[in-house]
Amino acid sequence: MDYGRTRRKRLLMNGSDESENQYAQHYVEFLETMSYTKFGVCAVCGFSCQVQYHFGGVVCGACSAFFRRTVSLNIRYLCDGDNQCKSMLKKCRACRFESCVKTAGMKRSLVRRKKPTIKTTPLYIKNRETHVRNEDVLRAFIPSYTHPSPANETVEDKGKFSEKLKLSHGNILKFYINQVRYAKRKNTNIFTIKTTEDFMRLVNFQRKIADETCSSFPGVELIDENNILILRKYLQFSSVWIESTWTYWITNSSVSVDNMEMDKRLKELIEHVKSTLLISLSQLKLNIFEFAAFKSFFVWKLVFHKTSVAMKTIGQEHYECVSSALKSYYQTYTSMDSTEIAVRIGEITLLLSLVFVSKIDLKSKSSELNFQQIYHDMAKLYVHLGLPF
C-alpha cells in the first residue's frame, strides 16, 4: 500500500488538525524512506526498463551509475556536435550527462564525491633516456589505486604537495596538460577558420569549455564568484588565442587569411597575433609540458582585471607548484644540468614578462610581443561582433 500518497490525499481532501510543519515532516520522511520502482521509460536513454528515483530524477540503473561515476570522479565530457547528438547513449557521453541534468533533473549535489585518499604514482618515472616520448611520459600521470609502502617513496617526492590546493605538484601540472592535449586533438584554432561565423562558433565553444573547466580548477573553491568570472575570461582568452597559436605551430599548419570572408578587425588581429606570438612560440619550441606550464602562468598572472588577495594567493600557489613540477620533469627526462634548467625556465618566464609589457609603441616595435594590446583589441573585437565578454 502506498502509505505516503494515501496519507497525503486524505490530509488534502478531508483536512487535518496537524499543522503544516507536521505534515511536511511526515511527507519528507515518506520521501526519504519510499522505494519507488516501476516499469517505464528512462528520461535519459529512452529505454523501456525498470526506473527508479536516483539523485533527483527517475532513471534506469545504468544512467544512474553513469551519472554517479561522472560526478564523483569529476569527469568532464565534451561533445563535437555542440551537445545536440541524437544517439546519446551509444555515442556521446557529454549529451548523455547533459540529459541527466536538464531532462531528468538529476542533481550533482546529491552525489557523494570520492574521498581524496587515493594514492597516486609518482609524477615522473626514473628514466633519463633521451628518446622517451611525451606520450610515454604522460602515462606516469595515471592514478594508481595501490598503496605503495613508505620504502618505495623517494626523498625528493616528499614535500611536493600543496596544502592549499590539496594536490601534488605533479597533478596540478597534469591538470593543465590535459587541457592542452584536448585542444591539440581538436585542432581547431583561430588560424584555421575561414569566416567570421567560424570564429564566433570557436569563441562560444571555448567559452563553454572555460565555464566547465573553472569549476574544477584546483583551489577555485577558495575564491568568490566575481573572481571566478575573471578567471573564466583569462582561461577563454588563453584557449582561443595562446593555445590556438601553439597548436597551429605544433601541427605545422599553413593557412592564409587573404580573401577570407571575415571581419576586417578580426583579420587584422589574427595577423598581429601571427606576427608576434606565433614567432615567439616558434623560437622557443615549447613541448607540451612547457607550454602547459606557460599557460598556467598566463592564466594566473592577473593583470588585466582587479582581483582579490585570495585569488592572488591561489595564483602564486599555482605558479610555485607548476614550476616545481616542470623542474622535476627536466631533471627526470632530460640530460639538462641545473644551470641549463634555470636558463630554460628563465626563457619561459621572460616570454611571460613580454606578454604583460604595459607600455610598448606598436608603431616602432610592431614585432615585439604585447599581450596587453592583444587583450584590449580582443575585447573591442568581441563588442564589435556582439560577443559577450
Swiss-Prot record:
A zinc finger (NR C4-type) spans 42-63, 79-95. It is found in: Nucleus. GO terms for molecular function: DNA-binding transcription factor activity; sequence-specific DNA binding; zinc ion binding. The keyword Transcription applies. Its main location: nucleus. Gene3D superfamilies: Erythroid Transcription Factor GATA-1, subunit A (3.30.50.10). It comes from the Eukaryota. SMART domains: HOLI, ZnF_C4. Residues 39-113 bind DNA. Keywords: DNA-binding, Metal-binding, Nucleus, Receptor, Transcription, Transcription regulation, Zinc, Zinc-finger. InterPro entries: NHR-like_dom_sf, Nucl_hrmn_rcpt_lig-bd, Znf_hrmn_rcpt, Znf_NHR/GATA. GO terms for cellular component: nucleus. Belongs to the nuclear hormone receptor family. Orphan nuclear receptor. This is Nuclear hormone receptor family member nhr-164. It comes from Caenorhabditis elegans. The gene is nhr-164.
